Amino acid sequence: MSKLIYLDNAATTQVYPEVLDAMLPYFTEHYGNPAAIYSFAGESERAVAKARKQIADVIGAKTEEIYFTGGGSESDNWALKATAEAYSSKGKHIITSAIEHHAILHTAQWLELHGFEVTYVGVDENGKIKLDELEAAIRPDTILISVMAANNEIGTIEPLKEIGAIAKKHGVLFHTDAVQAFAHVPINVDEMNIGMLSASGHKINGPKGIGVMYIRKGVKIRSFIHGGAQERQRRAGTHNVPGIVGIGKAAELAVANMEKNTEYEVKLRDHLIERVLHEIPYTRLNGDRTDRLPNNANFCFRFIEGESMLILLDQAGICGSSGSACTSGSLDPSHVLLAIGLPHEIAHGSLRLTLSEKTTMEEIDYTVDKLKAIIERLRSMSPLYEDFVRKNG
């Protein structure tokens, strides 16, 4: 197969043509600053308002609860740092999970250096947060619970409704990093008692450099970026109107096609999983088998070093990942795989393949065929595999 096979949609996605078409006029025709008072800026102002409603409709929020940011990482930083500052008089204890994206984990570590205490709740072997451990960790000085909606590496969908109920029971604010789940799986902020939510444009076939923060009305949160009075004086900086239009259109399209795309992606994903587990020995599927993002498959192959596997896949024209795109340059094993109990030597042999509605069954079968040959080749060069085969017949 001569064309590129892109199976790293959890890292970033191709911008939909309809999204690009919606954005283009705001670069060259309707380029006015939406904060300006003259009529020329009105088209930009209306475009921002429309996108705000498009985002709000996806999660069952009010338009005035939607704030635009520079991306998912900014939204996560804002959620933790600004909340910590705003609620520090009540307490300085924050709860999160051991498998969060580094935008959360590194921010939590920064807060620890600035006088806050963070509890990292464990997960089970499938990456589901331990709800009893979460509730037991809540203290009188707990000000925030932050748990992701779905894991970016292993695809496990977390029980947001149950987490939200626990947070509500104890009067604690609940934030979720929904970068991987937003517009891919149904989320309703009221039903799930979500106080804050982070999302990103480039994970839903929208542009890079634009994110979203949902902040429920009544939540105290300080400004994170200071300057002008944009975003109801909570997030300064001239609006990125083309990006805002893009994320709004992408969200609208994603939700309109969610049911159809989910059905299609699950069919391909399950075919991929079944072939890999059946045809490649000493392989493990990581993440929950059913409560899983529709496009995610994550495996560990024993006696394999992940970087070599990715290089050989790349030579075959296949784009995959060993985990998060934000850490794929690291040789350290995934903190997510270690948290679900995998030993270092197995975690090193991980592969994440994430599909899209444009992925074909032919591409999946080609990928599995190439992967089988690559695994066989790499294992043939492994003294550990040779020793294992000799001892186990």
Protein language model features and the residues they cover:
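Pyridoxal 5′-phosphate
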Residues: M1-G393
